Regions:
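Conserved short histidine dyad/triad with adjacent acidic residue
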Residues: 23-27, 38-55, 81
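Short acidic-glycine-tyrosine-enriched beta hairpin
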Residues: 73-90
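A cytosolic small-molecule/anion-sensing beta-strand core signal
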Residues: 64-65, 80-81, 98
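Glycine- and acidic-residue-biased ligand/ion/polar-headgroup-sensing regions
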Residues: 57-73
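Ligand-binding loop in jelly-roll beta-barrel domains
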Residues: 89-110
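A short, N-terminal "cap"/entry segment at the start of jelly-roll beta-barrel domains
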Residues: 1-36, 71
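Short beta-strand segments in beta-sandwich/barrel cores
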Residues: 48-50, 66-71, 92
């Protein structure tokens, strides 16, 4: 079994996100096209966001660092480090209220 230090990845990818013109950095922690379960660590610098997009399937978001706002239609949910959100199946987006890192877990059926 392989272990991964999420704490180390948080620091590494926050540094990358802060320096990137997009304000973001991502790293696949587990999964890929050959797996149903996919986990991606996403770092977003304060003031940046992920544009609204379609849901790929059942998904959750675990905030590892900072604070975020998840939006879907007219609804919005704020979350801080340690919070866990179930992502709606509707179109949604994610805004960094401050430098943040989240662990996105998606189950792809098919």
């Amino acid at each position: 079994m392989q272990t991964t230090s999420l704490t180390a990845l948080v620091h590494e990818h926050l540094t990358i996100a802060r320096e990137a013109s997009s304000g973001r950095s991502a790293h696949t922690v587990y999964g890929g096209h050959e797996h149903t379960l996919r986990q991606t660590l996403i770092a977003i610098a304060s003031g940046h966001h992920l544009d609204e997009h379609e849901s790929p399937g059942e998904a959750t978001l675990h905030v590892l660092h900072g604070s975020v706002r998840l939006t879907a239609g007219d609804s919005a949910w704020d979350a801080t480090a340690g919070d866990h959100l179930v992502i709606p199946l509707d179109r949604h987006g994610l805004e960094a209220l401050e430098d943040c890192v989240v662990l996105l877990t998606v189950a792809i059926q098919g």
